From Swiss-Prot:
<dbReference type="InterPro" id="IPR013131">
    <property type="entry name" value="Mannitol_DH_N"/>
</dbReference>
<keyword id="KW-0560">Oxidoreductase</keyword>
<dbReference type="InterPro" id="IPR023028">
    <property type="entry name" value="Mannitol_1_phos_5_DH"/>
</dbReference>
<keyword id="KW-0520">NAD</keyword>
<dbReference type="InterPro" id="IPR008927">
    <property type="entry name" value="6-PGluconate_DH-like_C_sf"/>
</dbReference>
<dbReference type="InterPro" id="IPR013328">
    <property type="entry name" value="6PGD_dom2"/>
</dbReference>
<dbReference type="GO" id="GO:0019592">
    <property type="term" value="P:mannitol catabolic process"/>
</dbReference>
<dbReference type="InterPro" id="IPR036291">
    <property type="entry name" value="NAD(P)-bd_dom_sf"/>
</dbReference>
<protein>
    <recommendedName>
        <fullName>Mannitol-1-phosphate 5-dehydrogenase</fullName>
        <ecNumber>1.1.1.17</ecNumber>
    </recommendedName>
</protein>
<dbReference type="GO" id="GO:0005829">
    <property type="term" value="C:cytosol"/>
</dbReference>
<dbReference type="InterPro" id="IPR000669">
    <property type="entry name" value="Mannitol_DH"/>
</dbReference>
<dbReference type="GO" id="GO:0008926">
    <property type="term" value="F:mannitol-1-phosphate 5-dehydrogenase activity"/>
</dbReference>
<feature type="binding site">
    <location>
        <begin position="4"/>
        <end position="15"/>
    </location>
    <ligand>
        <name>NAD(+)</name>
    </ligand>
</feature>
<comment type="similarity">
    <text>Belongs to the mannitol dehydrogenase family.</text>
</comment>
<dbReference type="Pfam" id="PF01232">
    <property type="entry name" value="Mannitol_dh"/>
</dbReference>
<dbReference type="Pfam" id="PF08125">
    <property type="entry name" value="Mannitol_dh_C"/>
</dbReference>
<dbReference type="InterPro" id="IPR013118">
    <property type="entry name" value="Mannitol_DH_C"/>
</dbReference>
Amino acid sequence: MKKAVHFGAGNIGRGFIGEILSKNGFDIHFVDTNKSIIAELNNRHSYEIGIASSEHEKISVKAVSGINNSENPEAVIEAIAKADILTTAIGPNVLPYIAELIAKGLQKRKEEKVQSPLDIIACENMIGGSEFLEEKVSDYLSESDKLYLSKFIGFPNAAVDRIVPAQKHKDVLYVEVEPFSEWVIDASHLKNKEIKLEGVHYTTDLEPFIERKLFSVNSGHAAVAYSSAYKGYKTILEGLQDEEILNILKAVQKETRALLLAKWAQYFKQDELIKYHELIISRFSNPEIIDEVSRVARTPIRKLGYDERFIRPIRELNDRKLSYQNHLDIVGKIFAYHDENDAQAIQLQEKLKITELPMLIEEVTGLSNQKLILEIEKVINHYKK
């Protein structure tokens, strides 16, 4: 049986990546620090996924096990040495923390003279996730290790899309997911050309698809979340039942379409993007999914990043002299976001009290364009509570 190592036994790992790997006949080693999840994976070697639709379909995922990387790093290294594919779904901020362990696994492959190619695919909400992970892994490799890596190890970037709300069940392994899913892999950077996962789309130019997903799904979801939080709604579904918030989402989508068409006209057509955005609205409005605003709005400082879901489109729309007012509007609401259970939300509000606004905007967004900084300052003051 083919072997997969997957970092992150959370909801996306089990509810999306695990499902695809299982359907493709992989024996999956989930790597995580959650003791109860790892124990259950090793006890049962299977779990169930529920599809959040009117049919309430159930999918069984089998041939799974767990390794606690903080308690048993050697077992992770051993698993990487024998793996046919390695994937992650742990969050962009956590990738640097698994780099050393992956490096040791690759060094073991080299020591054991493993010449079968291995692709390492970061399934994260970021542009260039696998590339970023490769940089972090390379920090722990010697020159001869890097030579081995260049011959046998691939880091193809990927785009993943599936809504998996925060949830709690008696069964710690059970996870509910939306029916829609999309996983796109950059085929041009694959080392193992023989593994083609069913249920995955392969392309030789991933960037337009990553941007379409990030600027449409991530930006759109966050636009609904911060607008809903500003008006006091607790769930995405509640927020979208407010016509004002639905119209805000549509206005953000319109700006996104303008940017995607300006950049990627050879890949996308206006009518196709309109249908894609209408599908996203129906996904966000799925009555079977109760998605907390706090989940979608969490880590506001990260979401204000230079290459993130609002600042990057604003920069690129500005460069092309296209409208970005609705994206800008959401940035103002992010700075007004309060959540006493979110460390970044607390930190942002504390920074607002003690830091000059232009300096804070520059620090958080990475912007140096004074026109954009001034515009953000105005919108922050507008939404200040």
